[in-house]
A protein has these predicted regions:
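Membrane-interface alpha helices of multi-pass inner-membrane proteins
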Residues: 234, 268-269, 280-296, 302-307
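Membrane-lumen/periplasm interface segments of specific transmembrane helices
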Residues: 123, 130, 303-304, 311-401, ...
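Membrane-proximal, lumen/periplasm-facing interface regions of secretory-pathway glyco-
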Residues: 131-136, 710-753
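Transmembrane-helix signature of polytopic, membrane-embedded enzymes
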Residues: 32-40, 197, 217-240
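Membrane-interface helix-loop-helix junctions at transmembrane boundaries of multi-pass membrane enzymes
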Residues: 99-104, 222-230, 275-279, 314-321, ...
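Membrane-embedded, hydrophobic transmembrane alpha-helices
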Residues: 1-105, 448, 455-460, 488-503, ...
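Hydrophobic, aromatic-rich transmembrane alpha-helices
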Residues: 210-221, 310, 384-411, 415, ...
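Transmembrane-helix motifs of polytopic, lipid-linked glycan transferases
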Residues: 75-84, 201-224
């Protein structure tokens, strides 16, 4: 019964949104497709659901599932009547596309379709098994939803600062308490349908959002007269983008919803501008406006959408308006006018060192150098696959092509994105969110659908304008350019790795785990290694004992160990030298089964080493097997082995996964996306050099870009399959409310449940703090577990 009511609660608003959109477009005789209407109808229906829940609470000061569901059903009636009376039926295939004629393109279509379904299946596994995972979700968005569920109303919450100052006005407090409630209400709605708070199923709307996005993107592509293979390729590129896939899988974040409204709103604006369909521009503007109900940053995207619309529809007027605005600001600054009061909106301008923006509040001015952070995330990290290199190639190709609507769309969209990034990060104190990589990827994620849609429009335009035919005499095989690019890339990689080797010839120092002596904690021999079975105050220390070692000759550490999934939070390698025997130097590593580190780059690794060892962290009942500790001279072969291991290493979900991603080891010497991007760039250069001797150079460049993306996605999908297996294995063992991250939350949850039983009044407020002041994660998790008991998290 619970699953039935959940399905009814989630599908009814979706169908209501679809019926309304399809009915309006059908009654107006507009050319529209069923898949696009289903996809966009989902977001329209859920926007209406949010309004219904908020209005019901405002009228009754309570929440009741069946009355709200009945109101939602009544709101579906006008859309259903319009749908039944529409003049034109919906359709799926566009008149201009038809089926793909080439067998190769049909294979590509079904490959992308199958891979898209696989990505959605992996998302479903995470949603169904994993409890709410991201930090922002359970400290803010879903903390508020959970509090509302137990309170039975959309009660106000305080910011933690109000409680810290001793002036609370609400029963609960949470960071971002003043943010719009859309994300929280959707999780609350799922809980109301279930009749209980289920930390996994409350995120089920996020899975439906992913399905709706795929439908909307494919449908919009077909309406734009893209061939089926290209529309499906775009849908696959969307759902296979690692950062989007991660947000879908982990749930609880507002970024998915603001991407649904802003991203597809901009898609509608672009599609309407390119094809001259004004109703799509209006619909796109409405979607962007709905983003105001998700996050305050929707104001920025609304301004960006207005600018994009102006550039697309009236480029000269928009350019003149921007220029006039700059002139007015310049004159005001020269005249000493730095801020003005806008009636009903508040102050806009600069007062002292603070920037005031209507609806967004005030923020400090600052100037940060963020280009290295953008390079690390957009070119080296795994959050985007090859999105940014492909966009750069598209811009380069458009520079040599004739003006067109797709070209104007891509250039305008990237300029708008650049302007928003500069406005948010480059010149204000919010730049620290980019510098710390907290939001540097999440903000561009909001416009990902529009970026990909503009990209495939450009690809289609370039293919249509290309003139395939017989090349000049001496035609070359298409494989020459990518093979030459591969050879150059490999040669460059080998030269880079070889240049970092000192060339010292020395036998390595090979210590088995059994050669290390436990001086804190206890364990037992396990083959040639040692198994740590007990941790003393949470740590175990293994020492080599006294030795004499020339650090300059053995500068590479290789460590192999095995541990349980919940074990080994982190580890440290330590050493002492003759120059300062009392000082212990150490470097810390994340949890993994194999570590290779260049000690020569570490502070303190110099002179003669007289002792070395390991510090392992764990808890009661956990074990760690230390197999070997090797100190070796640096070599090209060793670097290549380490690089391969780093590229194929599986990095489990972490609390930063919704901010940035590294599919392999985050400390790899060279990251695979950068290598693939270099190969793509060099291959494209060879294609350009040989363009007169190749039959279809444009098609070849597009094929190379797709091949590079598929290569990276093979690794990403493999990692996702491993992650799904780990998730099912961990959370399938009973009702586990604690997260599979190495923090000791399992024992925290037991203490929370015990203390709840000792409380005289469940309505009492709890104060959660830590003795050592460095356990912010556990403090906030305790606050979440204490619900419905109100509490305050004292951190620091």
């Amino acid at each position: 019964m619970e699953i039935f009511t959940l399905a009814l609660a989630l599908l009814l608003p979706w169908m209501g949104g679809y019926l309304l959109l399809a009915g309006v477009e059908g009654r107006c005789g507009l050319r529209a497709g069923t898949l696009r209407q289903l996809g966009l109808g989902f977001f329209l229906g859920y926007a209406a659901l949010y309004g219904i829940v908020a209005l019901y609470d405002a009228a009754t000061n309570s929440l009741a599932f069946w009355p709200i569901l009945s109101l939602a059903a009544l709101c579906c009636i006008p859309g259903a009547l319009l749908f039944l009376k529409r003049d034109t039926p919906g359709w799926v295939m566009s008149a201009g596309g038809g089926a793909d004629s080439s067998p190769l393109l049909r294979v590509l279509f079904w490959l992308c379709a199958a891979w898209t379904l696989l990505h959605l299946l992996l998302v479903a596994i995470e949603i169904l098994w994993r409890p709410t995972f991201p930090w922002d979700a359970w400290t803010s968005w879903l903390y508020r939803a959970k509090a509302w569920f137990y309170a039975g109303a959309l009660i106000p919450l305080d910011e933690p600062a109000a409680w810290l100052e001793g002036a609370p006005t609400a029963l609960y407090n949470a960071p971002g308490a003043s943010y719009p409630g859309f994300t929280s209400v959707l999780a609350l709605w799922s809980a109301l349908a279930l009749g209980q708070w289920n930390d996994s199923l409350v995120n089920f709307p996020v899975l439906l959002a992913g399905i709706a996005m795929v439908m909307a993107f494919y449908g919009q592509g077909r309406e734009a007269d893209l061939p089926p293979w290209l529309a499906m390729l775009g849908s696959y590129l969307l759902v296979s983008t690692p950062l989007l896939s991660t947000h879908l899988s982990l749930g609880g974040m507002a970024d998915i919803w603001i991407m649904g409204f802003v991203g597809f709103g901009l898609v509608e604006i672009i599609a309407g501008s390119v094809r001259g369909e004004r109703y799509k521009i209006v619909l796109g503007a409405c979607l962007v406006i709905f983003a105001l109900a998700v996050k305050n940053e929707g104001v920025v995207w609304l301004a960006a959408a207005a600018l994009l619309c102006g550039v697309m529809r009236w480029p000269r007027i928009a350019g003149a308006a921007v220029l006039a605005g700059c002139v007015v600001i310049g004159i005001a600054a020269l005249s000493g006018i730095h801020s003005v009061e806008l009636p009903g909106l508040g102050q806009i301008g600069v007062v002292g060192d603070r920037l005031h923006v209507p609806l967004l509040g005030e923020m400090g001015l600052a100037r940060l150098e963020l280009w290295d952070d953008y390079l690390a995330n957009f070119m080296q990290g795994d959050s985007w696959h090859l999105l940014w290199p492909l966009l750069a190639l598209a811009l380069l190709a458009l520079a040599f092509s004739r003006p067109s609507a797709p070209r104007r769309a891509l250039v305008a969209l990237l300029c708008v994105l650049l302007a928003t990034q500069l406005a948010i990060f480059q010149f204000t104190e919010h730049g620290q969110w980019a510098e710390e990589w907290t939001a540097i990827n999440r903000v561009p994620l909001h416009v990902l659908p529009a970026l990909l849609f503009a990209l495939i429009l450009v690809a289609h335009r370039l293919c249509a304008r290309a003139r395939p035919g017989e090349a000049e005499s001496g035609k070359m095989h298409w494989s020459l350019a990518p093979l030459a690019g591969l050879a150059v890339t490999i040669a460059g990689l080998l030269l880079y790795l070889d240049g970092s080797q000192p060339g010292v010839d020395r036998e390595p120092l090979n210590l088995h785990g059994g050669d290390l002596r436990l001086i804190a904690g206890s364990g037992e021999q396990h083959g040639d290694g040692v198994r740590v079975t007990d941790f003393q105050n949470g740590i175990a220390v293994l020492s080599s004992g006294a030795l004499v070692l020339d650090s300059s000759r053995l500068s590479v550490l290789e460590l192999r160990l095995r541990s349980e999934r919940e074990s080994q939070r982190r580890m440290r390698f330590f050493w002492r030298t003759t120059s300062d025997p009392q000082r212990v130097s150490a470097i810390e590593f994340p949890s993994r089964d194999y570590v290779r580190s260049k000690l020569g780059e570490s502070v303190g690794w110099h002179g003669t080493v007289i002792e070395l060892g390991l510090i392992l962290f764990g808890e009661a009942g956990e074990t760690v097997d230390v197999d070997s500790l090797i100190l070796a001279p640096s070599s090209l072969g060793g670097s290549l082995r380490t690089l391969w291991h780093d590229w194929t290493f599986h990095e489990s979900w972490g609390q930063t996964s919704t901010n940035f991603l590294f599919v392999g080891a985050s400390d790899a010497a060279v990251h695979l996306p950068l290598i693939v991007a270099v190969w793509l760039a060099v291959s494209v250069l060879f294609v350009w050099m040989l363009r007169r001797r190749l039959a279809s150079p444009v098609a070849l460049v597009i094929a190379l870009g797709v091949a590079g993306w598929l290569l990276l996605d093979v690794r990403w999908t493999t990692s996702r399959l491993q992650q799904a297996s780990d998730t099912v294995a961990f959370y399938g063992q009973g009702d586990r409310a604690y997260l599979d991250v190495p923090t000791g939350e399992k024992y925290l949850l037991q203490r929370v449940q015990t203390s709840k039983g000792l409380m005289r009044d469940p309505g009492d407020t709890v104060l959660v703090l830590s003795e050592n002041g460095d356990s912010d994660f556990l403090i906030w998790r305790a606050l979440y577990h204490y619900l419905p008991t109100p509490g305050f998290a004292h951190t620091g």
